[in-house]
Amino acid sequence: MRALFVYAAAPAILLAAVATAHAAPAAELCGVLRAFVGAVQPGQVRSFAFHTSWGTNFKHAQEQALSAKRCEHGGDPAAQAVCAYLMQHGQTELADATVMDSVACLSSGTTFDSSVRLHHAELSFRHEAINAGATITVTFGEETEQGGRVFRLQVEGD
């Protein structure tokens, strides 16, 4: 019965995710990301890592799961806010959509066509915060140690 649910539910979930992928990023996501970037001071580096697994749980997890999420914030309050948002709203089935939405939030004028899929990405760009500038580095790809995929965002203040 459990396998039947997985096979019946997975296509419906995937279709719903495809329909919403690449819509305009949520204002709340943009807000927590901009607050995270704005909190960095000159010479300071902040980061978070959002781990996702679709179709199975992470490698060392005991229980079975259709999907799983984890977020590492290192105790940084601004990163904790991003992680709280991503744990509630971040996509697992199309994890690259969360990455593209985040880049679109922080890099003005950047958009992605609905046909774009990210399998591996590493990009860096400037962001001008209210009081100072920052360099943002985004990486996305396979996570060999835990399994699944990982989206990392690092901000280095000028």
Spans of model-derived segments:
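Positively charged n-region of N-terminal signal peptides that target proteins for export
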Residues: 1-4
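Bacterial N-terminal signal peptides
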Residues: 7-17
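N-terminal leader/targeting segments
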Residues: 20-79, 94
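Long, charged/polar, surface-exposed segments that mediate recognition or autoinhibition
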Residues: 66-124
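A mature extracytoplasmic/lumenal domain signature
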Residues: 87-89, 142, 155-157
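Active-site beta-strand termini and strand-to-loop segments that position acidic
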Residues: 125-131
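Short, exposed beta-strand-loop hairpins at the edges of beta-sheets
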Residues: 135-147
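Short, low-complexity, Pro/Ser/Thr/Gly-rich segments in the mature regions of secreted, periplasmic
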Residues: 146-158
